[in-house]
């Protein structure tokens, strides 16, 4: 079968990726925008994208813009990085209002992820961590685990999805795995040593999933939608820890170009199964990317929402703001470093593609 992608399909995939990026960024910035307005802060410009404007319209006090590079967005608030306390400025708003305004962006990303998760869980169901069988010759077969066991914990950590086992094995590269399972309403604890599988180039213990189970109770759908978002957030945090420990190579890091390529691959692989499967697959990407953006923006780094929250929390502790000009310089330096990192990641993405 010829799996080559036509130029027309590539262009369509890029458009789809840009729409997904746009929606996620729009929701994030709208969170900032809404709470800025509620806190009495004047929003100078609300934009999707970066770089020069390609379209804009001026409202009563806010300019709404679409910019050339679809790599981010902004909600520029009056006096945000300046020593400015005039009415309507960011610094003139109550401290709690400023904290809510900054935190709202990531929170709105988590809300978007939850809404998308409802759609996915309602239509696909959940992969409950119930063992349906074993792979011959792999450790789980002789470990004492049994068909029908429901895995509740991995090394003391609660799990709710079968895929959590694979995630843990990848993150811990061959370390012993202690499973707490429920069997006939009793709990058993069993330790298994993973075995490296040359064919799949990964560590495995050799258990088989019972597949996805459709949920009939709407409250169960809501419960597992929350757990889906929680799992995605935890996976993002674990991946960051994995990266900081030096376990990931630079070639494994993806940025916007790599994500566009990944979205294109998702569309192409799901297209033969119909438009609804394509929609479900893209919804998975929106869930993953929106939760990722929420987590990444909460990192305590200059220029990110997390870095700005640190300064606001320090203001709450010391009951006075730190030097705002210094804070502005710190955020500017952080932004410059983030741009350098983005260029590196984009170069890395392009190198992998070509």
Where are these regions (language model features)?
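Internal alpha-helical transmembrane segments
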Residues: 62-65, 69-133, 340
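Functional transmembrane alpha-helices
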Residues: 93, 194-293, 310-333, 348-354
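N-terminal amphipathic/basic-hydrophobic helices that include classical n-h-c signal peptides
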Residues: 1-11
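Small-residue-rich helix-interface/hinge motifs
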Residues: 13-86, 296-304, 309-318
């Amino acid at each position: 079968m010829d799996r080559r992608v036509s130029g027309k399909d590539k262009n369509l995939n890029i458009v789809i990726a840009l729409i997904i990026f746009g929606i996620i960024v729009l929701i994030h910035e709208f969170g900032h925008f809404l709470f800025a307005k509620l806190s009495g802060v004047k929003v100078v410009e609300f934009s999707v994208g970066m770089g020069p404007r390609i379209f804009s319209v001026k409202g009563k006090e806010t300019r709404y813009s679409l910019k050339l590079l679809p790599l981010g967005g902004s909600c520029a608030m009056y006096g945000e990085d300046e020593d400015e306390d005039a009415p309507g400025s960011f610094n003139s708003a109550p401290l709690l209002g400023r904290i809510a305004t900054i935190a709202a962006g990531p929170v709105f990303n988590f809300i978007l992820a939850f809404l998308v998760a409802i759609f996915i869980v309602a239509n696909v169901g959940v992969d409950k961590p119930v063992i349906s069988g074993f792979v011959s010759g792999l450790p789980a077969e002789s470990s004492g685990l049994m068909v029908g066991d429901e895995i509740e914990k991995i090394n003391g950590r609660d799990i709710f999805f079968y895929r959590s086992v694979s995630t843990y094995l990848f993150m811990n590269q061959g370390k012993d795995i202690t499973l707490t399972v429920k069997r006939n309403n009793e709990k058993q604890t069993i330790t298994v040593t993973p075995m490296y599988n040359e064919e799949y180039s990964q560590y495995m213990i050799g258990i088989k999933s019972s597949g996805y189970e459709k949920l009939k109770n709407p409250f169960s759908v809501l419960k597992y939608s929350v757990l889906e978002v929680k799992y995605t957030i935890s996976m993002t945090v674990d991946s960051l820890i994995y990266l900081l420990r030096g376990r990931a190579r630079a070639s494994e890091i993806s940025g916007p170009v790599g994500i566009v390529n990944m979205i294109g691959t998702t569309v192409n692989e799901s297209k033969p199964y119909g438009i609804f499967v394509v929609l479900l697959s893209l919804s998975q990407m929106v869930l993953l990317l929106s939760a990722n953006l929420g987590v990444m923006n909460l990192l305590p780094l200059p220029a990110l929402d997390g870095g700005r929250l640190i300064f606001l929390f320090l203001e709450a502790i010391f009951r006075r703001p730190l030097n705002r000009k210094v804070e502005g310089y710190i955020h500017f330096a952080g932004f410059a470093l983030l741009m350098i990192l983005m260029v590196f990641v984009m170069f890395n993405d392009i190198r992998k593609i070509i």
